[in-house]
Amino acid sequence: MTTAEALSLLTAKTEPHSEVERNEMSKKVLILSSSPRKKGNSNTLCDRFMEGAIEASHEVEKVVLAEKKINYCTGCYACKKTGRCAQKDDMAQILDSMIAADVIVLATPVYFYTMCAQMKTAIDRTVAKYTKITDKQFYFIVTAADSNKAALERTIEGFRGFTS
């Protein structure tokens, strides 16, 4: 899907996903960029997506995961009891932003045939409130320096498993 096609879908009218009534023409868009390289291809595409969404009058927040402190999930499942992860880092705010968003853009470079570690770590940490983000509209930005189509497809399938 091209950026233009994605933005066309983004501007289509849909019902708001939150209890707060929003203008049907405007959506709350969260972009999660996981590239550790500020001038990398996936981060650059995130910036282009953001520019188009702002131009279309959407509210946009971009989070660069490499700039955040996000610990890996330890599998303790303390979150199942309290609804919040026991770890004190930036992921709690990111998860709140994911819940508040109508649209979530997941962007990653392909490293060693799959999404990069920063994205995988963030996805793993959504376990506390995973069911509150599955009804969102998702877009994927996946870049690779290799022409190996299977690596791109594998990464997209990983995202689809998370978003379905």
Q: Where are the predicted features?
A:
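Short, glycine-/small-residue-rich phosphate/pyrophosphate-handling segment
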Residues: 134-164
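N-terminal beta1-alpha1-beta2 submodule of the flavodoxin-like/Rossmannoid cofactor-binding fold
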Residues: 7-10, 17-107, 113-129
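Extreme N-terminal basic, low-complexity initiation segments
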Residues: 2-6
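Short glycine-rich anion-binding loops that position phosphate/pyrophosphate groups of nucleotides
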Residues: 110-112, 145-146
